[in-house]
């Protein structure tokens, strides 16, 4: 009977660890930022930078290598203006998404190797339209009627 119990505990610990890790969403924003501020940090980059250095700023908040990230090479004000286009349905079914009127320069960064503090990324430069989710601004956000809070899709 004892060997069966001994085999159970490591599995139980592994299950509990898995549940604990599942509670931390990869896209969770830092507590000190509004959703719009986190969007700007993660997805708005008016002047293109190499992915390895650009992702370092994002990864430092999370303390791990983010798998994939897209940077829009537009000023925040231009992305916020997209929030004034007609509403469309987001991937999650919510109706607060908006599509850009035109394609923009963007960079997609995909993790290829490394562990936190030494993350290596492959970059892909494209000109595409994008879809963002927008919400009313919170305290500390720029004063626009709606502000972008999530990059939903590149189209």
From Swiss-Prot:
Coiled-coil blocks: none
EC main group: hydrolase
Disulfide pattern: 65-119, 83-134, 90-97
Annotated catalytic residues: 150 (proton donor)
Domain of life per record: Eukaryota
EC number: 3.1.27.-
Record-level GO cellular component terms: extracellular space
InterPro entries associated with the record: RNaseA (IPR001427), RNaseA-like_dom_sf (IPR036816), RNaseA_AS (IPR023411), RNaseA_domain (IPR023412)
GO-annotated molecular function: endonuclease activity; nucleic acid binding; RNA nuclease activity
Keywords: Disulfide bond, Endonuclease, Hydrolase, Nuclease, Secreted, Signal
Major localisation: secreted
Protein residues bound to substrate: 66-70, 91
SUPFAM superfamilies: RNase A-like
Subcellular location: Secreted
Entry similarity comment: Belongs to the pancreatic ribonuclease family.
Annotated PANTHER family: RIBONUCLEASE, RIBONUCLEASE 7
Protein's job: Has a low ribonuclease activity.
Protein name from the UniProt record: Ribonuclease 8
Organism name: Saguinus oedipus (Cotton-top tamarin)
């Amino acid at each position: 009977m004892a060997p069966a119990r001994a085999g159970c505990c490591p599995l139980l610990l592994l299950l509990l660890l898995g549940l604990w890790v599942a509670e931390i969403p990869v896209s969770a924003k830092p507590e000190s930022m509004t959703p719009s501020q986190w969007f700007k940090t993660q997805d708005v980059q008016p002047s293109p930078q190499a992915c390895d250095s650009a992702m370092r700023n994002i990864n430092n908040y999370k303390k791990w290598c983010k798998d994939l990230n897209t940077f829009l090479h537009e000023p925040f004000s231009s992305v916020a203006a997209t929030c004034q286009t007609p509403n469309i349905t987001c991937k999650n079914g919510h109706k607060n998404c908006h599509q850009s009127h035109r394609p923009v320069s963007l960079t997609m960064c995909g993790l290829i190797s490394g562990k936190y503090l030494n993350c290596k990324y492959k970059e892909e430069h494209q000109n595409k339209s994008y879809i963002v989710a927008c919400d009313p601004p919170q305290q500390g956000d720029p004063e626009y009627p709606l502000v972008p809070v999530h990059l939903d899709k590149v189209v």
